[in-house]
A protein has these predicted regions:
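A short beta-strand element within the Helicase C-terminal
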Residues: 33-39, 245-246, 252-268, 273-276, ...
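Conserved segment of the helicase C-terminal RecA-like domain
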Residues: 104, 280-310
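Conserved helicase ATPase core of P-loop NTP-dependent helicases/translocases
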Residues: 2-9, 200-204, 209-254, 273
Length: 347
């Protein structure tokens, strides 16, 4: 990110009165400036990063982010120092030519849900013990002192509550693993890659292991050295077509010229993650129209996660047969979801 900002500042011959630093360095000492610009400001709500508002003395502040909303609600801290003054939707950005036009194909994958349904049944049974309160259940997992206090306040047996807590967490993890790392997604991803051999493709998977299972193209992840990852990324940037596979390492701040196809094998409810991942493929380039393929296991909670995370109306929900038509260059009948549902799919 710092390198990208530096490149743009040098292009505009503004290096003389502009200093670019990463947040980790800024919070270590006192600063003074006329204008403070904070990019990816949604990250600055953490206890350490939020000290930037105290260590920097500024006259004006400009904060930028793809999506300010956080699942933990801590964006309110940022708003205290920098209230929202303008909001640009993805549709508006496309209309004004700030990003390239794109279509997101939401591929609903049908598969045997026997295992998932059993996990979901057990998950709901354990969840009901906590009154369907996610925060209570999660705090019980993370904080034994909270669990003891909660048991005392509700006249519950601590040993039983502990068992329920970890059984609930286990089912939550296994249910998520079932949908995010399903083998059928690897199969569909390979099909898309084979049909788009002339494209520059980025894939996002739930885990490093899943990224490696795709079995074609380059793999970039956090367990490799920074030097090796830089070499891999530079190699991909020089390619006219090809594939680079990742889990989370390329979600933020990566600018790859020519990237026009993205396959998302793993999603959650976060608008931030969704906006940033889609942003990799829609960086503006004249004449480019990007394709985003989001793979979802039909009949599971994953569809609700996608619905909560979506930030654009440029989507088409399709099945596997319709995907085959799209990959073959044929027209399909599009359909959109009913957004009037009041069901909470967050978890």
């Amino acid at each position: 990110m710092k390198e990208q900002w530096l490149e743009k500042v040098i292009e505009r011959n503004r290096l003389g009165n502009c200093q670019i630093e990463i947040i980790n360095s800024v919070i270590k000492k006192q600063w003074e400036c006329d204008l403070l610009i904070e990019d990816e400001v949604h990250l600055f709500a953490s206890p350490s990063f939020s000290t930037i508002f105290n260590v920097v003395k500024y006259k004006l502040i400009l904060c930028l982010t793809g999506t300010l909303e956080r699942l933990d609600g801590k964006e309110e801290l940022i708003k205290k120092y920098a209230p929202v003054c303008d909001k640009i939707t993805m549709d508006e950005a496309v209309k004004n030519g700030w990003v390239s036009p794109f279509t997101e194909y939401v591929v609903m994958i049908k598969t045997d849900l026997t295992e998932y349904n059993e996990l979901n049944k057990r998950f709901n049974a354990y969840f009901s013990y906590f009154g369907w309160d996610f925060q209570t259940a999660m705090k019980s997992v993370q904080d034994v002192f909270f669990r003891k206090k909660w048991c005392k306040e509700n006249n519950l047996n601590f040993k039983e509550a502990t068992a329920m807590t970890y059984d609930w967490m286990r089912c939550l993890r296994l249910r998520k693993q079932f949908v995010q790392s399903h083998p059928k997604k690897i199969e569909i991803a390979r099909k898309i890659i084979n049909a788009r051999k002339d494209k520059k493709i980025l894939t996002f998977s739930a885990t490093i292991a899943d990224a490696e299972k795709i079995g074609t193209g380059l793999v970039l992840h956090s367990k490799q050295s920074k030097k090796l990852n830089e070499k891999i990324l530079e190699e991909f940037k020089q390619m006219k077509s090809g594939v680079i596979n990742s889990s989370k390492a390329l979600i933020t701040g990566c600018d790859i010229e020519g990237l026009d196809t993205e396959i998302i094998l793993s999603i959650n409810s976060s608008k931030i993650t969704k906006t940033q991942s889609v942003g990799r493929a829609i960086r503006f380039s004249p004449g480019k129209k990007a394709e985003i393929f989001t793979l979802i296991i039909a009949g599971t909670q994953e569809f609700g996660w996608w619905r909560n995370s979506k930030t654009s109306s440029n989507y088409v929900i399709i099945d596997e047969e319709q995907l085959d038509d799209i990959l073959a260059g044929n027209e399909i009948q599009s359909r959109k979801i009913d957004d009037n549902s009041n069901i909470n799919f967050r978890f």
